[in-house]
Amino acid sequence: MKHTAELTVRSYECDSYNHVNNSVYLNYLEFGRMEFLHAINFDYKGIVAAGYYLYVTHIDIYYKSSAFLDDVLEVTTESAKLGKVSGEFKQVIAKKDGTVCAEADVTWCCVTKEGKPSKIPQEFMTEGLLPDNN
């Protein structure tokens, strides 16, 4: 499943070059992932209460074009891989006209509250976490 979340670039996210600072894209990606999890009815609060966390372990970002103040951006997120302990999201940040600003591959894993890798508890596996095979 793909999910798209929309946001508008705010002034404090722009740097001295008047475009969105590259570090801000990490926040946009996090926003997109959380909106994706809400959309697939993933029980994020429940998994935390059960003593498990989903940690981002690696992000590759490919910057394609600049975004500027008041640009409306769409953050599209989809599950690309899912294993027993970890998974990968593919994310794209684009302007409303389709111009891609950034693409990212985000690897995450499930860990216990002690920080040890763990299988994703079955009760938290939702269909939306499964990659589309189309």
Where are the predicted features?
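Terminal targeting signals and extreme-terminal segments of soluble enzymes
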Residues: 1-74, 80-134
